[in-house]
Structure formats: structure tokens, C-alpha cells
Amino acid sequence: MERVRGLVELLRPGNAVAAGGLTFIGAFVAGGLSSPQSMAFAVVATVLATGAGNAINDYFDRDIDAINEPDRPIPRGAVSPRGALVYSVALFAVAVVLTLLLPWLAIAIAAINLVALVAYTEVFKGLPGVGNALVAYLTGSTFLYGGAAVGGDLAAVVVLFALAACATMAREIVKDVEDIDGDRAEGLRTLPIVIGERRSLYVAAGFVVVAVLSSPLPYLLGLFGWVYLVVLVPALCGLAAATWRSFSDPTTGQAWLKASMFAAAVAFVIGRLAVVA
């Protein structure tokens, strides 16, 4: 039973399902519910691929997790490193099969993401800013993948991609500030270790500013109406508050950044609903 629990935890199910939700949002913003089967394939593939990525990340991070998160499945012995690796490959395989049933652009995005994910976990995670940028791209690209899966208009989805990527970049930097002790013990060269915690938080704040400035574009381009702005404003206030909080409490700040980014994504859904209603 402990092994089953460990396998589920490796997926980080909340994170995987949330990624599937982002793909759904991207598909809906691009094409509404015009292609339900393609949308379903894309959402399930995203959940599986994200779970696989989380599992392989735990495989490569097992030594760091022994310091930062000793209760994770591999450090506590619930799942062996080899078992986590095989599990990840199996999940990736199913995700690939589902993706091959989608349009070529979705396949191309998925292929790029797979290479980026493997490169992140094995090569770039400990490099200052590079690993953060890859995670930011991967998060934002879930919207692009969803939009490409249904073959819809990607204009608003591209803006959503930029907003999500910038907000995620900020959150990843704040998380590195939070994890600085374990990362330093492991010999990693994350941004806070190289340039300092305070400067890193200012860099994160800069990415939030870019996210906030890009967010009105769907309205300015005539893609969404005023309803979008009404729903968007609280999300932007949340991003600002999260950035401010990160300077005194990185743990709370990065959690608020994640919630605010999701709230901004909901604004895109409501903006789309208002257009088609």
C-alpha cells in the first residue's frame, strides 16, 4: 500500500491535474468546445506528461530532496529510483500516443516540451535562471498546446502564454530563494545563490511587471470585451500582492503567485465566454 501511495505522490496529482486544467483553458480560449475529442486527448496527455515529468524530476532530485523534502517517496523508500524512472517512461509513452492523434502543431509543441523537460531535469535545473526559464516556458506552453490541439485562433492564447510564462518565471525564482539552503548544500548555482536573494526577488518582480503589462492586450486588440478586464483586475492585484509578500515570506509569496496566475487564466475563459455568449 505504501508503494501505491508513493507512486501517486510522485505524480504530484494536484499539480498534474492543474496542468491539465491549463490545457483545457488554452483549448477553450482558442476554439470553445468545437473539438471535444481533441480537447480531451490533449488534457489527458498533459496530465500524464506532467505526472511523468514530476516523477523523473524526483528521480534526478533524490539527493536534494533528502535534504529539502525527506518525506518525498524516493528519500523515504516508498519507491526505488529505478521504479520511479520506469514509471515516468510508461506515463510519457501513453501521453505520446494520445498526442499523435492531434494536429501537427500540437505534436510539434509536445515534442519541443519533451526535449525541454528532459533537458531541465538532467542538465539545466541547477544553472542560474536557465532552469527557471525552461519551467516558465513549459507552464505557459500548456495553453499553446491546448489551443493547437483544437486548431483554433491562437492570438489570445499567445498572450496567455506570455502572461503565464512571466508569472511562472517569477514564482520559480521565489521558490529558489525559499530552497536556497538545500540547493547550496547540493552545490547548485541557482539565481539566488549567484546574485543574492534580494536581487533575485527584484528580478522576479520585473517579470511580474511584464506579465501585468501584457495582460490587457486581448482587450486592446479587440479579442475580448470589458468583462475580461473586470475579472482580470483582481488577478493582477493578487500578482502585485504576491510579489510584495515574497520579499518577507517567499513561501507564502510563491503560493500567492501560483493562485493569481490561475485567476488570470480564468479571466481569459470568462473573456472567451462573453464573446461566444
Swiss-Prot record:
EC number(s) per entry: 2.5.1.42
Bilayer disposition of the protein: Multi-pass membrane protein
Keyword Membrane assigned: yes
Catalytic activity: sn-3-O-(geranylgeranyl)glycerol 1-phosphate + (2E,6E,10E)-geranylgeranyl diphosphate = 2,3-bis-O-(geranylgeranyl)-sn-glycerol 1-phosphate + diphosphate
Cofactors: Mg(2+)
Residues spanning the membrane: 13-33, 40-60, 89-109, 143-163, 199-219, 220-240, 256-276
Cited InterPro entries: DGGGP_synth, Prenyltransferase_related, UbiA_prenyltransferase, UbiA_sf
Main location: membrane
Subcellular location: Cell membrane
Alphabetized GO MF terms: geranylgeranylglycerol-phosphate geranylgeranyltransferase activity; magnesium ion binding
Designated name of the protein: Digeranylgeranylglyceryl phosphate synthase
